[in-house]
Amino acid sequence: LTSTTYVDICSGDISHNYKELFNLTVSLKAKLQKDDKRKETMKLDIVKNRFIFLALSAILLLPGIAAMIYSTITYPTHTPLKVGIDYTGGTTLQYGVKEAISNDKLSDVRQALEKGGIDNPYLQIINVNSQQNTELKSILSIRTKFIEEGSADQDKITNIIDSEFTSPQLVQVSSVGPTLGMELFKNSMIALSLALLGIVAYLTIRFQFDYALAAILGLVHDALFVCGIFSILGLLYDVQIDALFVTALLTVIGFSVHDTIVVFDRVRENLKYYSKKMTFGEIMNASINQTLARSINTSLTTLITLLALYFLGGVTTRDFVLAMILGIAIGTYSSIFFCSTLVDIWEDKKKSDKAAAV
């Protein structure tokens, strides 16, 4: 409120200052409501328990990291995850059968194929919609090393399937050459690298490098968790990754960094108004609590949709959906409890270094 406005008010001449007074009143009221709301939303003390959350992250990641190390040592491909034919090259043969295939029957077929000289076959059951096909009950998908169509190896597989089932039908044969598989793998890694570089550049420009580094570590945290779970599933249930898995990882990275940016943006906004009244830890706590409901609600609505797809969708997209479910769940956790605590630790260290220098 300027001195001129004050004199005009006292003299009764306020007509030309009406708009200014109205704006000041609305601004003051909004600020007071904002302050009250921010005080009310402070519920969780994330900063106080930051080392507990970091320890929890380590507990979540260690089993998966151990599985990836073991897989790298033991797999013929020397990869931390069991890779499918999209990356190694290979052939998929699909046989339609007139009976439902149990897990025990699947195990018997796998043993028969291995005894017949087919190394490391990957078997998958695809249920057939009765409305689409009245004769076939299931489709048995067999992935193996690259074989030529009509070759002796394909005939060998067909003969084994003929001996295990009644009148099976070869419905589809598809192959990916080793060169194309390596090209797909290289392109996938380039896509991941470009995504990470773009995120670092954007966050550094919009915030500062500390925030960008925390966000990238959060993304590494999320990717390690998802890859670790799939490494364990590969060891226990022969789950293989393909191009859809990398697509899921890229989607998870985008979703997770979006959640992290929402928190960091609120921190930046609160620092403008409360940096002299509150410590950085208090501002971080307030910012997390103000965005907590939004983050959880957004993730829950997405997870409900993904769970419906997982249980009701087709088997061919199930691993993709599972990777999305795991990634969004851990991404929500990391944006709230992991990235924010890293920034707070670095801010404390900067403050300590500055005090020591003085």
Task: Indicate residue ranges for each PLM-predicted region.
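A structural signal for conserved, well-ordered secondary-structure elements
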Residues: L1-T4, D13, N17-V358
